[in-house]
Amino acid sequence: MSNTPDQPMVPSSQVPESVVVFELDGTEVTVTDDGLTLLEALRGPLGVHSVKDGCAPQGQCGCCTVLVDGTARVACVTPLRRVSGRSVTTFDGLDSAVRSEWATAFVDHGASQCGFCSPGIVVRLEALRTKAAVSPAGADGLRDGAVERALAAHLCRCTGWQSIVDAATEVLGGSGAEVAVELHGPNDSSRDLDAAARRATLELGAPQVIGADVVAGAVGFSADTAPDGCLVAVVDPDGSWVLGESVVAARRAAGKVQGRRTTVDPVPPLEVPDGDWDLTLRTGWVDAAYVETDAAWCEPGGEPSRAAANGGAFGAKRHSPLPKVAQDLANEHGRAVLALWSREDCSRSAPKRPPIAAGIRADGTGVLRVVATDGIVEKIAAVAPGVEVIEVEVAGPPTSVTLRAAGWAEAVVLIAGIGAPSDVVSVEPATGISPERVVVRTTDGAVAAASVTAAGIVVHVQAGAALD
């Protein structure tokens, strides 16, 4: 069921309509403001798509970071009226040479994967460079840990921090990676970005491209590429789809205030089975926490766009319902429709890792209770054949084995933690020169080894020949 776009709008605030004038990427712009955030204005009437909506209005993911008079700000919690008469710079407004420099460094170091969070990260790091340049010490004014502190305002679930830190170190200077690596930029003739994309696609199990456009966030995300003039569909508090002529109009028609805090305690839903166990483990409803929220658009009679434009989502979007929703609504209303989930919608409705509660003995036998999920028993048995797996029906969010290593990783933790014999997991004891190592071998031949030292956690991965 869906509501039509001509229903009376429910205003989200009592702010009277006014006009806000400010400088955007070097050009003066005028926007009618009736309580908009800066992000809503940028992505709406101003059409700036390098600024992403990953969590609005939580102000936590950093994907909407812009410069306001040179200072990094998250646009989703900045009222539009606050930038009146000021200068706003997005990723698109950075000098082309600066954008190219960052793109080269990010591609060099593998600091982007899907690219959704990259433009906002680059903007904040560029603000860090500007801040250092005006300090008395110049570039040397970047103190140790400055990049890491800047990144604390961002969530990137794909690459891990180190590759981003290394890219920033290359651009900003300072202490970089401990091991020197010969790197080549995206325009280097020795690079094969198509091969890199094939490798990334193999690793992710979903199509992915590699290149400068990824760093710019310009890889065809559905929320960015929907046709001009399309209807926007969002979910109301009752779970029905409500349509409007824009994201703001649809959300106001839905009458739903986006949440910023949960009221649910993170308590694992299953109890550990009775028994005399050497090791136990309980997990809750673990969300994949991908930053690009589910979105898909479709023309009447056409095929919908993909919910995951450039990999990402850790397998959680493999069966996203939004492409089918967009297709059905487009056919129903005879217009292109963009179906859009908010961060809250993803948290409520996207699939989670199946929660488990398990006990295991030193010989590798035990009992593992898991929320009933198609295919989960086979995933766990492949790692822990001596563990009895019991599926339990539990009310809660959807679960799926398509999430990266769902069930499999939890079983690995149990087997490795107890040191039980396994064809998948082995524990190599410490020697005089090497710490204890846990080695994991997948069924398709990949090998990973991890050890804990005083300096940190050391991980080695062998996953086939590097294609690029």
What does each model-identified segment do?
Residues 24-30, 74-75, 95-97:
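Extracytoplasmic/cell-surface-exposed regions of Actinobacterial cell-envelope-associated
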Residues 33-68:
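A basic, amphipathic helix-loop patch mediating RNA/tRNA/ribosome contacts
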Residues 66, 71-82:
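Glycine-rich phosphate/adenylate-binding loop and adjacent beta-alpha elements
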Residues 2-3, 7-9, 15-33, 48-49, ...:
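Cofactor-binding beta-sheet edge motifs in enzyme active sites
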Residues 10-17, 60-71:
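Polybasic, low-complexity association/targeting segments
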Residues 59, 80, 121, 431, ...:
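Glycine-rich beta-alpha junction loops
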Residues 59-60, 73, 119-124, 316:
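Short glycine/serine/threonine-rich phosphate/pyrophosphate-binding segments
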Residues 35-49, 77-195:
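Ferredoxin-type iron-sulfur electron-transfer modules in oxidoreductases and energy-metabolism complexes
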